[in-house]
């Protein structure tokens, strides 16, 4: 990949593949103007923290298996609903 056009093609493919395979929201959230890098944001909602954890691990595994990208790292954040 040597251009923004190539990068956008790969990112679009990733967004479509992950969106089809997993019930998550996914978008490119940073580095849109760099052809060498992309940052993806992935969101999942569930009543079970364990379910979200398994889901995010599955998404990460799918990304790591791709031959057209290199996964440099992951950062996970969790928000819990306040008790009423």
What are these regions (language model features)?
Residues 1-21, 25:
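N-terminal first-folded block
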Residues 5-8, 30-33, 73-75, 80-83:
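Solvent-exposed, flexible loop/coil residues
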Residues 14-19, 30, 59-61:
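Homeobox/homeodomain signature
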Residues 20-22, 36-40, 70-72:
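A generic structural signal for short beta-strands and their flanking turns/coil linkers
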Residues 21-26, 55-59:
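Short amphipathic alpha-helical surface micro-motifs
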Residues 26-48:
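Short, charge-patterned binding micro-sites
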Residues 45-84:
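C-terminal structural segments of small proteins and small subunits
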């Amino acid at each position: 990949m040597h251009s923004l056009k190539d990068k956008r093609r790969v990112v679009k493919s990733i967004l479509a593949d992950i969106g089809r395979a997993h019930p998550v929201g996914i978008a490119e959230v940073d580095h849109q103007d760099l052809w060498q890098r992309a940052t993806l944001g992935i969101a999942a909602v569930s009543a079970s923290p364990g379910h979200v954890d398994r889901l995010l691990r599955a998404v990460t595994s799918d990304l790591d298996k791709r031959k057209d990208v290199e996964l440099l790292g992951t950062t996970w954040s969790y928000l819990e609903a306040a008790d009423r």
